[in-house]
Amino acid sequence: MDPGHKAGMTRRSNFKDRALMSGSELTIRPIAEGDEAAVIALWQACGLTRPWNDPARDLAFARGKPSSDVLVALADNRIVASAMVGHDGHRGTMYYVCVAPAEQGRGYGRQMVAAAEAWLKERGVWKANLLVRTGNEAVLGFYCELGYEPGSTQQIEKWIDPEKRGDR
């Protein structure tokens, strides 16, 4: 354990202790204690939660590792967007990228992706992947506008702990 690291506290770098991006309308920063309920409500409003994924567990897991975090965007002191970001040392992945339905079309999604990319670049990561659910065609065009394109690999999956599977 790091010196000064308190049990139950997530280790934070200098990067995570400051706002990532701040503008006249939007401030993007790492998730803070007390933000969890608002972030989960945002994910639910955006249709990102699934019965087999416990969003509170996903948040805790991402926050408990130095190679991942959850970024949030605030407008008028309300959480209006998020991006979960992590990496394996050279390849970064973004999950739960979303903007509150009432706030879409204001450029917040672009700013969230840019903040997640900046988070990865600061850690020496040079490639970013996005996870997009099958059938979510509307968001694919958005990501293509940002320079993302279908890759040459296909994601395959296996539940290695069947008890966690739930109803797919």
Give the role of each language-model region:
Residues 26, 30-96, 100, 113-115, ...:
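Acetyl-CoA-dependent GNAT
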Residues 110:
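Residues forming the Rossmann-fold NAD(P)(H) cofactor-binding site
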Residues 100-106, 134-135:
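Active-site acidic-Proline motif in GNAT/NAT acetyltransferases
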Residues 120-132:
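Conserved GNAT acetyl-CoA-binding A-motif
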Residues 143, 148:
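Conserved active-site tyrosine of GNAT-family acetyltransferases
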Residues 9-34, 161-168:
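Conserved N-terminal entry element of GNAT/NAT acetyltransferase domains
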Residues 130-139, 157-161:
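Conserved beta-strand-loop-alpha-helix junction that forms the acyl-donor binding cleft
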